[in-house]
Amino acid sequence: MTDYGEEQRNELEALESIYPDSFTVLSENPPSFTITVTSEAGENDETVQTTLKFTYSEKYPDEAPLYEIFSQENLEDNDVSDILKLLALQAEENLGMVMIFTLVTAVQEKLNEIVDQIKTRREEEKKQKEKEAEEAEKQLFHGTPVTIENFLNWKAKFDAELLEIKKKRMKEEEQAGKNKLSGKQLFETDHNLDTSDIQFLEDAGNNVEVDESLFQEMDDLELEDDEDDPDYNPADPESDSAD
């Protein structure tokens, strides 16, 4: 007859020796304990971690222990679900023998896989962003390829803008036509300007002042009187140039 209590006590001692820093006893009856499992360091020393809680059933190891995710860090919901499925599979495969070390080892490997997946996912995201940036740069350099659809869209927009320009121009020309003077109006306007100049002079009358200083320097000019020349003949134009 199997002594389940003895097997459970022996395994507990072994687990405490293997996991001295992460093994914690929660209760002795029924035997319940936790083991914290941490992945290897990934990119930027990032890790994922979970604390597994186990409780021995009365006939363990012929019956599977009770287990649950007691706590976790950096795990997605789907990761937690995958770990629980893994524990169920491993417990089923190891019935009849003590299995906690085997279950913990399987979870340890799973956490390492998750870290690798996180690294791969980030690398793919980085490559995707670089690809999108490169495509955007190419698009900016080469422009948008002309298709029937985008040409028709451009044509409709162009026609609408052209129509607005024509309407604006017609409105300006119409407004200019209203303000444009006829030939008769231009003539009357010029005549009125002449009349206003004459009227200005008449109104000035004797009030117009002449600046005599403009003529003061005339006295300083040495003018030669041609009539004092004895050879000067008024009837002979060439006599003046005989000299």
Swiss-Prot record:
SUPFAM superfamilies: UBC-like. The gene is RWDD1. The keyword Acetylation applies. Residues 10-114 form the RWD domain. The modification N-acetylthreonine is found at residue 2. Residues 209-243 have a biased composition (Acidic residues). Residues 142-197 are annotated as: Interaction with DRG2. PANTHER family: RWD DOMAIN-CONTAINING PROTEIN. This is RWD domain-containing protein 1. One of its GO terms (biological process) is androgen receptor signaling pathway. It comes from Homo sapiens. Protects DRG2 from proteolytic degradation.
